[in-house]
Curated annotation (Swiss-Prot):
Annotated Pfam families: AstE_AspA_cat, AstE_AspA_hybrid
CC cofactor: Zn(2+)
Role of this protein: Transforms N(2)-succinylglutamate into succinate and glutamate.
Residues of the active site: E229
Molecular-function annotations in GO: hydrolase activity, acting on ester bonds; succinylglutamate desuccinylase activity; zinc ion binding
Protein name as catalogued: Succinylglutamate desuccinylase
UniProt catalytic activity: N-succinyl-L-glutamate + H2O = L-glutamate + succinate
Keywords: Arginine metabolism, Hydrolase, Metal-binding, Zinc
Pathway assigned to this chain's UniProt record: Amino-acid degradation; L-arginine degradation via AST pathway; L-glutamate and succinate from L-arginine: step 5/5
Superkingdom of the organism of origin: Bacteria
Length: 349
């Protein structure tokens, strides 16, 4: 029988989940207890950790929180490691089944966005098309971990959540914003209210199925899923985490089952109307490197040229998000969105 002292020693690494992951180490045991035996934990592999209350109820929420799908997006990784520490110490009560995922440990250790291919473009089985990529087996592993985790989750609305935390390459008109995957259903008021509580200023609504982690969990696992963009890419240790306090607090309230959050304003909504796809390395993107995400452009403005391909603004005003001419040919070099706040809020399910 494992003693309380042995259990505490085995769980000491939970004080710095990030350090263990960056070192590429495994914990001394694969399962144990923490938080004075109030929480059970199981290490599921590199950067993967499941936590659940010792008295977990059958109808308890199941929440997946991920960060580091892009290895250089350090602030959310640090927030997530601190969340694990506080749960393990008993400083933050756990009132859900929680799966913690540091998405791309190899890229995190290298200090790079990715090693071979953008991991957040390889979900929904797309990894099978790039079998030689070092990101491909990780995408398959994350899919399997999420599917297994949610396979025993409740099916009521709001029983399954996935919060995938990122930071952006560029600054943004809205410093912190969210992206909701396309599911064929209207977005939920539950998600919009939670994003308002997190003081997320804007939400981008996808209109086609995608290959991101949050698309996979929404489509394949039935989760209320979102991608959070919480600021700008910075090196480990250089982040001012206080800038992310509202979003961090909202995640903590979600996993601790608290319902005492002040209701924030619903975020503004923007719907994707088109994208710029890189046809070749000859792509010219007429958007300067210092242009923030969500910058508006007027009808007729030429934004991209690539051989015979042109993209000019078709609506009275379109805003560009994630302009990036450095992506590989065939991938998205920018999203174009229009504001749909009134209609989106009216249609919330």
């Amino acid at each position: 029988m494992t003693s309380s002292a042995d259990s505490g020693r085995d769980a000491a690494w939970l004080d710095d989940f990030l350090a263990l992951t960056l070192a590429g180490d495994a914990p001394p045991a694969e399962a144990g207890e923490c938080a004075a035996r109030a929480v059970r934990w199981r290490w599921l592999g590199d950067g993967l950790l499941r936590l659940e209350p010792a008295d977990a109820a059958q109808r308890m929420q199941s929440v997946l929180v991920s960060a580091g799908v892009h290895g250089d997006e350090t602030a959310p990784i640090e927030l997530l490691s601190t969340l694990v520490r506080d749960i393990a110490r008993g400083a933050l009560p756990l009132r859900c089944r929680l799966l913690v995922a540091l998405g791309n440990p190899g890229a995190m250790r290298a200090g790079e966005r990715y090693l071979d291919d953008d991991l957040n473009r390889l979900f929904g089985g797309r990894h099978a098309q790039l079998a030689a990529s070092r990101e491909a087996p990780r995408a398959a592993q994350l899919e399997a971990a999420a599917a297994l985790f949610f396979s025993t989750a409740g099916r009521a609305r709001g029983a399954r959540w996935h919060i995938d935390m990122h930071t952006a390459i560029r600054t943004s008109v809205f410093e912190q914003f969210a992206l909701l995957p396309h599911t064929g259903e209207p977005p939920t008021r539950t998600m919009f209210e939670w994003l308002g509580e997190a003081q997320i200023a804007a939400v981008l609504l996808h209109t086609t199925k995608g290959s991101t982690f949050s698309h996979f969990t929404a489509q394949a696992c039935g989760a209320l899923a979102c991608t959070l963009e919480l600021g700008k890419v910075m090196p480990f240790g250089a982040n001012d985490l206080s800038r992310f306090a509202p979003a961090d607090a909202a995640v903590r309230r979600l996993v601790s089952g608290r319902r005492d959050a002040p209701r924030g304003a619903l975020p503004r909504a923007f719907t994707v109307v088109d994208q710029i796809t890189k046809q070749s390395d000859a792509l010219e993107l007429f958007v300067a490197n210092d242009v923030p995400n969500f910058t508006p452009f007027a009808r007729g403005t030429l934004l991209a040229r690539d051989g015979d391909y042109r993209y000019a603004v078709r609506h009275e005003q379109e805003r560009i998000v994630f302009p990036n001419p450095s992506v590989k040919p065939g991938l998205r070099a920018g999203l174009l969105v229009i504001e749909t706040t009134r209609d989106t809020h009216a249609a919330l399910a």
